């Protein structure tokens, strides 16, 4: 059957490496090494006064009170020569938070390839009979992290166009491409309601243009004072249960609304009070068994396209004895090169874990975390990364069982910079201060008005007590790779400390700050305990 052509995830915005704009979705372009700039004397002269001043400045920044009691691994390298320009605790094993996604993305490009795409099929045992009937129907997922409700509707239309009018038996959601382990063993149970801790499945429906997997958008609207608030479960309407105890408070009263999914349930619980004059409140919340939600949505799509399902909707794999199953519809995702943009720009945990399990399928025929993480480490070793200081427990960095060193992160950055997929890798990284979220990502609101704006390309990482920023500073005087990994701070994440270092590196690489925006000496303030994209703050 002819496969549908994938649509670009976003229009492309052009710009060279280190320019003011970064591609949001890729087209065919020449792949250029990231180390084309030779080392200028200003960068290469390790005995120069400029380098001494740089080291002193970074030392001063790291004295900030925000880092009291913390351990910080900081390494800066000239990518052209491999020369280490700065190092503090570079060999210390630390939690990486979402900097783990750098390793996952590199392994996915190495194992799957930048042109890899993910398929979803609709299968029956045979073609429809004269009455347009088939017995059972299977919606088969193979790890597409961007499958949307619109894609399901398009496949339902294909099923109808194939002549199917009635499914006499059941509709099954087949997610057996991956195993049935939904969550990493040490992820915190209290995180389960939130989009950054969604269940992982080979068949999941992505929400919105950022492709959040395994979630639904819950909307709460005030009614008349004293009346229950109105709750819309979005895509999960009719699939998840609703426990609505939220009330409408007086105009101007406090908003105490809480939207939860209690652990082990498929119930959205809404409590608290929403003022009568408040705007509607929306929040992404996870669902139990994302594949079952996909099946529910596909049944609705079939009904909308004139196909009736007589039986139930459930989970199940295509029978092994269906040697010549009839594929009635299919969908092919965009290529990995494009999928990496929402994955890395918005630090999407669901994408990371689906990629790990896809790597496991590719390397070992097993869509499991165990197989996938072995595949990730082997790919990194094959790339030339020294993995001795690396401990992998998931692909996203949400696990507190992961360990990296700043040395290893910078090693990865250097090896990735000379890989055939270097341009694809670069295009996926957030760019400092760029207001377009598909360019700036989690750095969209950071380092604006500084020498780093539109220049620094780096992956963020933040969760309680852990924060990191690692990436590149290209410039007219050469290119730097850097990693900053902070662990053990007791207050908010020291984002401004990281930003001050990145700005100083941009200045060192030859960029000029706008008038009045030079780096300020002395204390800087941090903020946030989670990635800004996880809480819809960027």
Curated annotation (Swiss-Prot):
Enzyme Commission designation: 3.4.16.4
GO molecular function: serine-type D-Ala-D-Ala carboxypeptidase activity
Propeptide part(s) removed at maturation, as residue ranges: 516-538
Active site: 98, 101, 347
Biological processes annotated in GO: cell wall organization; peptidoglycan biosynthetic process; proteolysis; regulation of cell shape; response to antibiotic
Enzyme class: hydrolase
GO cellular component: extracellular region
Main subcellular location: secreted
Coiled-coil ranges from the UniProt annotation: none
Domain of life: Bacteria
Activity regulation annotation text: Inhibited by benzylpenicillin, cephaloridine, ampicillin and cetiofur.
Residue ranges of the region described as Absent in class-A beta-lactamases: 146-319
Keyword terms, alphabetized: Antibiotic resistance, Carboxypeptidase, Cell shape, Cell wall biogenesis/degradation, Hydrolase, Peptidoglycan synthesis, Protease, Secreted, Signal
Residues given in the record as substrate binding sites: 459
SUPFAM superfamilies noted in UniProt: beta-lactamase/transpeptidase-like
Signal sequence region: 1-49
Annotated region (Disordered), positions in chain: 1-21
Catalytic activity: Preferential cleavage: (Ac)2-L-Lys-D-Ala-|-D-Ala. Also transpeptidation of peptidyl-alanyl moieties that are N-acyl substituents of D-alanine
Family: Belongs to the peptidase S13 family.
Known role: Removes C-terminal D-alanyl residues from sugar-peptide cell wall precursors.
Protein's name in the database: D-alanyl-D-alanine carboxypeptidase
Gene this protein is translated from: dac
